[in-house]
Amino acid sequence: MATLRSLLLAALLWVPAEALSCYGDSGQPVDWFVVYKLPAHSGSRDTPKGLTYKYMDQNSDGWQDGVGYINSSEGAVGRSLQPLYRKNSSQLAFLLYNDQPPKSSSARDSTGHGHTKGVLLLDQEGGFWLVHSVPRFPPPASSGAYTWPPNAQTFGQTLLCVSLPFTQFARIGKQLTYTYPLVYDHKLEGFFAQKLPDLETVIKNQHVLHEPWNSSVILTSQAGATFQSFAKFGKFGDDLYSGWLAEALGTNLQVQFWQNSPGILPSNCSGAYQVLDVTQTGFPGPSRLTFSATEDHSKWCVAPQGPWACVGDMNRNKAETHRGGGTVCTQLPSFWKAFQSLVKDWKPCIEGS
């Protein structure tokens, strides 16, 4: 009887584990979200400089003000990454990669690897892919806590999180053999290493060895939304956007990227589709918040007439034509509308380009 009573009590006290997925600003699981960390100058006087952000997910109907600040573990990014820093993470697998890894990690900056930043966090049911533009982020699992790096406060940044079934991570693994990320922290053991051999390859600093030097795959989210990943290896030898993406999507593109680096590629109208460098971004609403591309480290692009929009980790400059990297695109109407509304100005093509 005592044993039965104990079992009943245990059943009453048992709480099922939270599903591993992206978590939104609402504190609830979401299929996907985008966080746009705003440049430091854009905050009001009574808010911390460089920590405010805009947010959207499948339920938000466009951009909203972020809940709290980007350095909070209660917001979408911090809450989604919490499982990484918990002590009971034995049933998880993860990869943290960044061409500019956190200074607390043993990895060094590397131009030999791809210009690519992201997080894979999963269990045997599924998890999420966080594609972002943030240097020195996130902290390694051993740090024990989510933090936002001080170096990433000044400029704008983008983070796209997509919740995915386990089956999709083999496809992501294939893509990472093209982008050739610098992995600075990982855990891929037993079941995960067996089922995801391409991720094991990536952890061992290996990459694709033969043509083609680019790859695209369809990814289906936990809720059935369709995303398309585009990945290129350094030997592709061309700009991601004008050399491949515009033609692959069959559309003109307006591209936001970091324009303070050397060798910036000008707007390109030499092909069937125009690829135009965005120079000014602005959010809708009474504040009329606008900022220059020189204040914005984010990487995204949008088809001016629809239906595509993409968030990734590559710039348009000469050096990155010879580095791996990629972007994740979708035709979700709300996603496209949100990014299309941001473009306020761009550089026209000069004659002959």
UniProtKB/Swiss-Prot annotation:
Q: What class of enzyme is it?
A: hydrolase
Q: Where in the cell is it found?
A: Lysosome
Query: Might you give the EC number(s) for this enzyme?
Result: 3.1.22.1
Where it mainly occurs, coarsely classed, is: other
Active site, per annotation: H297
This protein's GO CC annotations:
lysosome
Keywords, in A-Z order = Apoptosis, Developmental protein, Disulfide bond, Endonuclease, Glycoprotein, Hydrolase, Lysosome, Nuclease, Signal
Task: Name the linked condition.
Answer: Absence of Dnase2 is a cause of severe fetal anemia and of perinatal lethality due to malformation of the diaphragm.
As for what it does, the entry says: Hydrolyzes DNA under acidic conditions with a preference for double-stranded DNA. Plays a major role in the clearance of nucleic acids generated through apoptosis, hence preventing autoinflammation. Necessary for proper fetal development and for definitive erythropoiesis in fetal liver and bone marrow, where it degrades nuclear DNA expelled from erythroid precursor cells.
Catalytic reactions of this protein: Endonucleolytic cleavage to nucleoside 3'-phosphates and 3'-phosphooligonucleotide end-products
Region forming the signal peptide: 1-19
The source organism is Mus musculus
| Disulphide linkage map | C22-C161, C269-C349, C310-C329
Task: Kindly list every residue the record annotates as glycosylated.
Answer: N71, N88, N214, N268
| GO terms under biological process | apoptotic process; DNA catabolic process; enucleate erythrocyte differentiation; regulation of immune response
Which protein is depicted? Answer: Deoxyribonuclease-2-alpha
Q: Which family does it belong to?
A: Belongs to the DNase II family.
| InterPro entries reported in the protein's UniProt record | DNase_II (IPR004947)
Any one Gene Ontology molecular-function term assigned to this protein's record: deoxyribonuclease II activity
